[in-house]
């Protein structure tokens, strides 16, 4: 999707206005303590810009986790975020115990100039997502009239709307698409994310390499399909490589992952690659295990030898790493989505770590390297490479849908320029 034609915060006049801002404060918590404040820090530039440019107030709304519909458990409260935000901004943050309704509307109607207000978790109301589950696990659907009321109440909390929640941009939730204000702009985090993906997908540097890992082919069909129209080379690694190798080379894969559904379209994908002149690199050797366990016995295998019955491949071997390194060395732009082994376990992390080292090396020689959220972003955190690649996405699902060529509802809803 083209992202260059949307209103962004730097072009929005906020002076004297109440800004209602959707952020992504869905942070990990343990015993009501925040264990990683990255997402809160990521929203600070947009908040500060509004305050520095004379906004009357900044009203922040976010979800946290996925609470049941009904009584609101403390562990899903955004109260601890207000405390963290106060220390990051160096100014008071008013926390409200709800996100809609007469009391919230009153508190946000005419606040003191320069106020920062944080609303309670949006998902305490089923109207945010439109559906949910009650405490017994029964499905609950929101009534259309109540969704309208919920959206109207959110719309009363500001004069202009800013969306800086890239991580939720693929969800058509009320706070993402239902705030009805004349000007709706993307915040700085949203802008940074969209700029990277726009550049990568709309005018890539070439050769352009996609590294695709992860487990199931079926989950990645749309991704592979869309990227085959854009890239010059593709590494297909991780668990899904076994489905390709079994279909294409009739390789014995033991108890490695095999995706029945995905297997049906492997040949179509390969013929599309051939037609588009895309060079595909698959692994040629493996680190194997006698069970799916951190402390499993390990072995080695190649495509030619196959993996014996009762064993499974959990990482690529050193020959595969050499092939991957050659592909990385040829690239001027890389998008990486999905690890190439079970990186969480030391015995099976070498392949992903070796690939990460090559991607870092490529970045230092001027290659544009984009890590698409989720597990691959976790790899960056694990090996401290977040600042050694060009961009690590904050949105797993959102970045995946962009790479699949889908329109993101949260971006689509912003004002055109």
Swiss-Prot record:
Record: residues binding CDP: 214, 219, 238, 338, 340, 343
Name the UniProt record assigns to this protein: Phosphoglycerate kinase 1
Binding site for Mg(2+): 215, 218-219, 375
Residue numbers of Phosphoserine PTMs: 2, 4, 203
Lineage, broadest ranks: Eukaryota, Metazoa, Chordata, Craniata, Vertebrata
GO cellular component terms, A-Z: cytosol; mitochondrial matrix
Predominant location category: cytoplasm
Source organism (scientific name): Equus caballus
Binding site residues for (2R)-3-phosphoglycerate: 23-26, 38-39, 62-63, 65-66, 122-123, 170-171
Region called Linker, residue ranges: 187-190
Binding residues for ADP: 214, 238, 343
């Amino acid at each position: 999707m083209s992202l260059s034609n949307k209103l962004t915060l730097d072009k929005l006049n906020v002076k004297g206005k109440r800004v209602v801002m959707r952020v992504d404060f869905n942070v990990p918590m343990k015993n009501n303590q925040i264990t990683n404040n990255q997402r809160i820090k990521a929203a600070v530039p947009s908040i500060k810009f509004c305050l520095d440019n004379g906004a009357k107030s900044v009203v922040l709304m976010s979800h946290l986790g996925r609470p049941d519909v009904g009584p609101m458990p403390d562990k899903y409260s955004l109260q601890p975020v207000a405390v963290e935000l106060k220390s990051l901004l160096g100014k008071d943050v008013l926390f409200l115990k709800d996100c809609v309704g007469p009391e919230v509307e009153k508190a946000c109607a005419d606040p003191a100039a320069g106020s920062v207000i944080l609303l309670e978790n949006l998902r305490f109301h089923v109207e945010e997502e439109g559906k949910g589950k009650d405490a017994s696990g029964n499905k609950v659907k929101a009534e259309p009239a109540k969704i309208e009321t919920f959206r109207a109440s959110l719309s009363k909390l500001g004069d202009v709307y800013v969306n800086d929640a890239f991580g939720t941009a693929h969800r058509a939730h009320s706070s993402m698409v239902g705030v009805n204000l004349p000007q709706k702009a993307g915040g700085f985090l949203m802008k940074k994310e969209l700029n990277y993906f726009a550049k990568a997908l709309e005018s890539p540097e070439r050769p352009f390499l996609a590294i695709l890992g992860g487990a199931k082919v079926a989950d990645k069909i749309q991704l592979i399909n869309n990227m085959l129209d854009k890239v010059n080379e593709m590494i297909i690694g991780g668990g899904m490589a076994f489905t390709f190798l079994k279909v294409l080379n009739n390789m014995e894969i033991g108890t490695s992952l095999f995706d029945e559904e995905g297997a049906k379209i492997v040949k179509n994908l390969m013929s599309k690659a051939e037609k588009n002149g895309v060079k595909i690199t698959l692994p040629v050797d493996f680190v194997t295990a006698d069970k799916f366990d951190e402390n499993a016995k390990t072995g080695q295998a190649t495509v030619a030898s196959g993996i014996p019955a009762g064993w499974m491949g959990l990482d690529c071997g050193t020959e595969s790493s050499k092939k991957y390194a050659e592909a990385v060395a040829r690239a001027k732009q890389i998008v990486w989505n999905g690890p190439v082994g079970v990186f969480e376990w030391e015995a099976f992390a070498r392949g992903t770590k070796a690939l990460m080292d090559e991607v870092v090396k490529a970045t230092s020689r001027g290659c544009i390297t984009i890590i698409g959220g989720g597990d691959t972003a976790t790899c960056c955190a694990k090996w401290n490479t977040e600042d050694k690649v060009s961009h690590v996405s904050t949105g797993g699902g959102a970045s995946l849908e962009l790479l699949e060529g889908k329109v993101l509802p949260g971006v689509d809803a912003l004002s055109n320029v």
